[in-house]
Amino acid sequence: MPLFFFSRQMTRFAAFLVFSFFTTPAVYAEETGTSEKPFRWAFGAVQVENDLFANFANTDRHYTNGLQASLLSNPIALSGWLGEVATIRVPFGLADSAPAEHRIGLALSHSIFTPDDTSSTALLTNDRPYGAWAHITLTLQTLWKSRGNGTFQDQWKIDVGVVGPAAGGKFVQNNWHKLIGADEANGWSNQLHNEPGLNVTFERAWNSPDLAPSQLAGFEVNGIPYAVAALGNVQTYLGGGGIVRFGPDLPDDFGPTRINPGVGGSEAFIVSDAFNWYLFAGVEARVVGRDIFLDGNLFNDSHSVDKRHFVSDLRLGAVATWQNARLSFTHVYRTKEYSTQTKADQFGSLALGFAF
C-alpha cells in the first residue's frame, strides 16, 4: 500500500510538472527583449557525459556514460504542499531573506558503470560491478533574495527509477558499440540485480556580494560555493565545494548543469543578444555513505567492492552563450572510489541548453 500510494503521488506530481510548462500564466513570464534578466524564461537542456571526451580513446571504464534531457519551467506560483517544501528554510545564510522565485523541473537520465576490463566474461571480484541507472528527476527550485547575502539557489530533487537489467545498460552500451564499430562489453551477465531506486537530494548554491566579480587583467573573476546532501538506496553522501569563474562579463547565474553525483548549477542562464563566454575551475569533496554501484544491491546479494568514503572531483570547463542558447563543456578528474582501483577517473560533460 505505501509503495502504491507513493507511485500514485509521483505520477500526479510528474503530470503537474508537464502541465505547468504549458499553462504557466503570462504574469510570471515578463518580456525580456534584449535585456539580460536571466530567470523569466523556461529552459531545456540535453547533456552527455562520457569518458571518451576526456581520454580520447574508444575505451569504457567505471562511470563510462551518462545521458540527461531536462526541462525547467519559467517562474511559477506554488501553493499547498509544494509551496511548503519549496520554502523550507534550511539553515545557513538565509537570515533576512525571502523566496523570490520558484521553478519546477523534470529530467530523464541514464547512467552506465563498468569495470576496468570489459573484455572478460568472468566476474571480476577486485573490480567494480556492471550497473545501469535509469531514472526520472523531479526538481523544486527556489531563489532566495537577501539584502546582505546576495542570492541563494535551493534545489530539492527526487530521483525515482531502477538499477539493474531493467535499466537497459547492456542494450544501450553494446548497441552503441556496434554502431561505431567498437568491441562489446562482455561481462553484463554479472551486473547488479534489478532494484527500484529512490533518492532525495538537497543542493544550495550561493551567489554572494562578498564574492562579486572583481577585475583581473581586464576580466571579471568570481566564486560560487555550494553544498549538497543526498539520501537514498542508490547514493547517500554529503558534499561541498565551489567554482571560480573568469570571463569578460560574468552572468548572474549559477553555472552549467551536471549529472549527479556532483552539484551542477541550473538549466537557467542569462538570455542576451550579445555573445558571452567564461572559463571556470572548481573542486568538490564528498563523504560517501552509500553507492549502490560500489556497495552492490541493498535487497539482494550481488557483486561489490570496498568503497572509499572520501571522494573528490576537480573540474575545468568553458561556457559560451548567445541569444537563447548555452553550450558548456566540463572536464572532470575524480579521485579513486574504491580500494582496489588502480587509477583515478576522468570524463567529460557536454551540455547544450536553450531558453524558450
Per-range role (PLM):
Residues A54-N55, T121-N126, E184-N190, V228, ...:
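Extracellular loop and loop/strand-boundary signature of outer-membrane beta-barrel proteins
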Residues R61-L67, Y130-A134, D154, N194-V200, ...:
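Residues that define the transmembrane beta-barrel architecture of outer-membrane proteins
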Residues T87-V172:
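Long, hydrophobic/aromatic-enriched structural stretches that serve as scaffold segments
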